[in-house]
């Protein structure tokens, strides 16, 4: 990974508590960032707290992002980044690699997480993170991307 320019690992697993990977990254000279993607309230709160740092990290590039399989939580994390941050900067939506219609899956879990993050961001800040119309439009774009055969 170092030879390919990776400087940052983003670990999306909420259910993994060992320090093994963070210590391995540290020994290898790679930064490690845990951004837990899970539906339980404690993890949603953590995601929202870390969201600005996560966005900055993605913007900086040269990262490797993964969960256990590298598909489903990755889709959720990158869609959350796009809906609540990157779309406003003119960045294209991420390709959907895990929750794809041609793989027999739907975007229901992505939508569930986006709805939950929207709700918690609104409650935390006292104002909607984006207008409801924009939010719905962006969710529709993600749904359409999941139907595409282009990855």
What are these model-derived regions, one by one?
Residues 12, 150-151:
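Short linear motifs in intrinsically disordered/low-complexity regions
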Residues 66:
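Short, surface-exposed ligand- or partner-binding patches at beta-edge/loop junctions that are enriched
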Residues 18-20, 73-76:
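Short catalytic/ligand-binding loop motif for oxyanion handling, primarily in non-cytosolic enzymes
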